[in-house]
Amino acid sequence: FGALGAVFAFFIAKNGAFITEIVSDIIGSKLENWQTAYIVGGVLGLLLLLMRAGTFESTLFENATTTQVKRGNFFMLFRKSHIKKYLACIVIGLPVWFVVGVLIALSHKFFPEILGLTTSDADVKILKTLSVPTPEMVMWSYIGLSTGDLLSGLLSQLFRSRKKVIYLNLMGIAIMTLVYLYGPTGSQNYYRMIAFLLGAVTGYWAIFVTNASEQFGTNIRSTVAATVPNFVRGGVLLITMGF
């Protein structure tokens, strides 16, 4: 549910003045917007740290620390026996950031083409009444993403297979992308629903990272779990350039 931070950020941006007033009353002096953001972010970070304080490693990982096996060596992933699996794990996650980084984040560029509008004054007015602001599209997609993450975990338990659930999500992304770009036009609520569903079908991040790490031995699982998501996020640059 970490993605809900983006939802919280939307409400902070929308009601920033109100929150600034509350914080200013507490500390007795007026704050700039960036100072409010620092305080809110710092408090949330400390709360997250407290919630993680009770976590512990399994005995499997604890036993690995007492062996002489190399641990956390990133370059081990480039061995012939590992590189194909490692690249495949990265590719599986790229559609998530294609949806979030392109379809949702650049929705303000898609709406004129989706709605078949031009730059005329009349069409600009229509665009304002039918399109959804990008921050709100992000909010709805992240609510969907959090919901999808929960459902994908439950479905993987039900099917006893993460692979099947990931296949379902990838097919869902393909279908919803076509509906979003080439489907019928609708009202703002229709596009809010589309943003939510796009987020829901990309909600396999947790099982994607878990699946990636479990392809490798315990000595490099933490390295895989840390680097695969970062390469996927970095892939947004190539995706947007290619798009």
Residue ranges, per PLM feature:
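Flexible cytoplasmic inter-helical loops of multi-pass small-molecule transporters
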Residues: 53-74
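Extracytoplasmic gate region of multi-pass secondary transporters
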Residues: 82-148, 236-241
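Intracellular juxtamembrane helix-capping segments at the cytosolic ends
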Residues: 107, 203-216
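A late C-terminal transmembrane helix in Major Facilitator Superfamily
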Residues: 143, 213, 218-243
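Structural signature of the two symmetry-related core transmembrane helices
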Residues: 164-179
